[in-house]
Swiss-Prot record:
Disulfide bonds: none
Residue numbers bearing the N6-(pyridoxal phosphate)lysine modification: 273
Transmembrane segments: none
GO molecular function terms noted in the UniProt entry: catalytic activity; pyridoxal phosphate binding
Tissue: Expressed in young leaves and flowers. Not expressed in roots.
Family: Belongs to the class-I pyridoxal-phosphate-dependent aminotransferase family.
InterPro entries: Aminotransferase_I/II_large, Ethylene_sulfur-biosynth, NHTrfase_class1_PyrdxlP-BS, PyrdxlP-dep_Trfase, PyrdxlP-dep_Trfase_major, PyrdxlP-dep_Trfase_small
Quaternary structure and partners: Homodimer.
GO BP: any one term: biosynthetic process
One Pfam family of this chain: Aminotran_1_2
Name of this protein: 1-aminocyclopropane-1-carboxylate synthase-like protein 1
Length: 488
């Protein structure tokens, strides 16, 4: 036995598992960017990162607030007096003032139409940690969750890798803007049951830049209520909605429906997308189930948010004037950036999935595929990464059922970089069309030449045939079958 094999025997199955999801093109694109990152002056030919759903559009507002409120940080002269209180061990339930500030912020980000209890707010290390925590609370290894496609590429890691939970895709179609239908849910649920898979719940997220309307949400709640399975709503893009229909939380739906088993309803939230603070690693599990809240709180000790971060954000999120202005601005700025990018694509003849929220669009490049297969999608994606030098995410990495869709993020860069990205896409599209037209012209010319050649050959045959006939009739040298010479 080789040394490597012996060493592997000493490791866990998890350590040797390939189920983390790193093999996905979603992560490969990030590596391409990391190896050759674009910079306007130092590396203008580098790869532009458009595979990262990050909100950098309102960081100036946060910076300005920090300047005006230096006492909010324990690392400033104005806030140093609180250093000892914050630096010591804190209960992993989280600072009370922080949980209250988060609950209030969640209410305001949802238009003040719902109320959240601070005691149900459980901290976690980003939405990644929150999603995994809720899986540990709701399912055992081998159990499964229904997840409509396309879905967030990293769900394969967040939901499955350490928990052993299975994902059952619910296939949705572009024919209705990838909306979730009851028929698709019932079909996926029935197939899972027929194969002996235990379905524990349904997870809905937003990888498309769309928001769910009231009717769809009511249908989903009715579905899980009838099946008595859980509903986990990933609401991390709540404040990025910029057009109708506005964002509707599942919390709003269940307070309006006549009968709902609230123990089955859970929300995942974070400050990464709405506030543009992914580096702060603030995730939230909000559950209406007391047992889940208790379990999630105990598990939160494995992924705490630092007390320094909690203290700082508690101060900022408690400033209602700042929060109200921030929420208005983030919606305006996302709308402006979305319009800028989609309008630029439209001028090239590229359409996108109709969207009203999020930090990205689903770009339709089906017309640029060699054929309608995922192999062709991957071939096109490699060209975009290596030649166009833009990192976008192919639909297959989001388990999209149709090849040719690409998720492109537009809020993680400045406007100048976005314009450079649009120029690169334009050059690529124009070049692709020119090549196709050239190939088409060559094919047409070849067809015309072949047609001319065949026509010439046909006429030549007719001409030769005619000449032979005339020669047969007129030539004195031609010996007739009845010639006495032949008979002799």
């Amino acid at each position: 036995m080789s040394q490597g094999a012996c060493e592997n025997q000493l490791l866990s199955k998890l350590a040797l598992s390939d189920k983390h999801g790193e093999a996905s093109p979603y992560f490969h694109g990030w590596k391409a960017y990391d190896n050759n990152p674009f910079h306007p002056t130092h590396n203008p030919q580098g790869v532009i990162q458009m595979g990262l759903a990050e909100n950098q559009l309102c960081s100036d507002l946060i910076k300005e607030w920090i300047k005006e409120n230096p006492q909010a940080s324990i690392c400033t002269a104005e806030g140093i007096d609180s250093f000892s209180d914050i630096a010591v061990f804190q209960d992993y339930h989280g600072l009370k003032q922080f949980r209250q500030a988060i609950a209030t912020f969640m209410e305001r980000a949802r238009g003040g139409r719902v109320r959240f209890e601070a005691e149900r707010v459980v901290m976690s290390g980003g939405a990644t940690g929150a999603n995994e925590t809720i899986m540990f609370c709701l399912a055992d290894p081998g159990d499964a969750f229904l997840v409509p496609t396309p879905y967030y590429a990293a769900f394969d890691r967040d939901l499955r890798w350490r928990t052993g939970v299975r994902i059952i895709p619910v296939e949705c179609s572009s024919s209705n803007n990838f909306q979730i239908t009851k028929q698709a849910l019932e079909s996926a649920y029935l197939k899972a049951q027929e194969t002996g898979i235990k379905i524990k719940g349904l997870i809905i997220s937003n990888p498309l830049g769309t928001s769910l309307d009231r009717e769809t949400l009511e249908s989903l709640v009715s579905f899980i209520n009838d099946k008595q399975i859980h509903l986990v709503c990933d609401e991390i893009y709540a404040a990025t909605v910029f057009a109708e229909p506005g964002f509707i939380s599942v919390a709003e739906i269940i307070q309006e429906m006549y009968y709902v088993n609230r123990d089955l309803i859970h929300i995942v939230y974070s400050l990464s997308k709405d506030m543009g603070l992914p580096g702060f690693r603030v995730g939230v599990v909000y559950s209406y189930n007391d047992v889940v809240v208790s379990c999630a709180r105990r598990m939160s000790s494995f992924g705490l948010v630092s007390s320094q971060t909690q203290s700082f954000l508690a101060a900022m999120l408690s400033d209602q004037s700042f929060v109200d202005n921030f929420l208005v601005e983030v919606s305006k700025r996302v709308a402006k950036r979305h319009h800028m990018f989609t309008e630029g694509l439209e001028e090239m003849g590229i359409s996108c999935l109709r969207s009203n929220a999020g930090l990205f669009v689903l770009m339709d490049l089906r017309h640029m595929l060699k054929d309608q297969t995922f192999d062709s999608e991957m071939a096109l994606w490699r060209v975009i990464i290596n030649k166009v030098k833009i990192n976008v995410s192919p639909g297959s990495s989001f388990h999209c059922s149709e090849p040719g869709w690409f998720r492109v993020c537009f809020a993680n860069m400045d406007e100048d970089t976005l314009q450079i990205a649009l120029e690169r896409i334009k050059d690529f599209v124009v070049g692709d069309r020119a090549n196709k037209n050239k190939n088409c012209n060559c094919i047409c010319n070849n067809k015309r030449e072949n047609k001319k050649r065949k026509s010439f050959q046909k006429n030549l045959k007719l001409s030769l045939s005619s000449m032979r006939y005339e020669e047969h009739v007129r030539s004195p040298k031609l010996m007739s079958p009845h010639s006495p010479l032949l008979r002799a």
